Amino acid sequence: MKILVLNSGSSSLKYQVIDMESEKVLAKGNFERIGQARSFLTHKVNGEKHKFEIKAENHEEAIRFVLKRLINENYGVMKSLDELIGIGHRVVHGGEKFTEPVIITDEVIDTIKECTELAPLHNPSAILGMEACKRIVPNIKMVAVFDTAFHQTIPKERYLYPIPYEYYEKYGIRKYGFHGTSHKYVAYRVAELMEKDVKDLKIINCHLGQGGSICAIQNGKSVDTSMGLTPLGGIVMATRSGDLDPSVLTYLMERHELNAREMETILNKESGVYGVSGVSVDFRDIEVEAASGDKNSQRALDIFHDSVAGYVAKYMVAMGGADVITFTAGVGEKGQDSRQEICNRLKYFGIKLDEKHNQEIKGDEDKVSPEDSSIPVYVVPTNEELMIARETKKCIEEGERK
């Protein structure tokens, strides 16, 4: 019982084959530079990496090559593609159209295309992957799993923006939220670690990577999240500004004669901790510079830590407390100092970390708070691919029962 998980980028294709009985990854890889003169596939199976150079003009050629490798005598994990019970596609934006994973049909693809305005950089790539698979393996069921779907349970008073209501009605301008697959995985996983039902918990999950978002989860459902209409909103990130006074945009656009696209580039690619520090998009580099006395690097980290702690505090108010706080993704899993600094800012609430144990946890799964912390704090490495595989399996099985 195997599922292929696909994440199609504009010029890349990431994949995993997961055995659903053991939930182990049998093979995974990354196809890069699709559509360019030289394309490369890194394929990992049985702990060994294999690299291939092949010219893939488009996603269909890349997927055909990957599927051949998966049933290859030397590099494969299946005798035939018939062993696949389904293919799960990661889709960034489902708008208000999709509140849960769906079996992919021509009608579903058309509806996803309607959401492209909300995710012009991501949805078209996912569609390419779906359409290619429909041509190559038309008999294998496919499921679309949306990053935004988990947040469709956020109440209206929290997802509406305080601008004229007609903009929501005409253009769908509202908070959608992202990283939903990660937030859902971590919520269910930490409930397992605590030996409790996720429906009995109030969880605040901090997904901190190059991009980052905080999510308030109550009764297993998202009730608020920091990202908004796009992944630009919310906490300060590596190169993204996060929340700021909207007048900053109009001031800079007038002062520097910037158009909307140029302003968007500044906010998405030149801001965040990189913009403040002027050092790097990598938090580790900024930490090194801060430790050596660079004031702007230290300020960048302080702004980031304040930003995350502020959202955690906000969501404790929104839910009337929290039963657990979790850290996940690159910085959340491996940034021991950032975890400590964020929790130090929350000590008013009685939140503490075991400083020694926290420093020992780098990418591992464990509780990092002492027993006298008012709220337990966990590090839970995310696994979006496994969550997509689970959702794909569940969606297919439910469809078969109907």
Language model: regions and residue ranges:
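Phosphate/pyrophosphate-binding loops at sites that engage ATP/ADP/AMP, CoA/4′-phosphopantetheine
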Residues: R69-L84, V190-D197, V312-D323
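Extreme N-terminal starter segment of soluble prokaryotic enzymes
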Residues: M1-L4
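Internal helix-turn-beta structural module
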Residues: Q298, D302-A318, D323, G332-K402
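Adenine-nucleotide phosphate-binding core of ATP-dependent small-molecule kinases
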Residues: T265, G272-V276, F283-A318
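Glycine-rich phosphate-binding loop of actin/hexokinase-like ATP-binding domains
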Residues: F150-M253
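Short glycine-rich, Thr/Ser-proximal phosphate-binding strand/loop in the N-terminal lobe
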Residues: S12-A56, G228
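Short beta-strand-loop/turn "lid" adjacent to the catalytic site in phosphate-handling enzymes
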Residues: L70-H122, V143, A149-R158
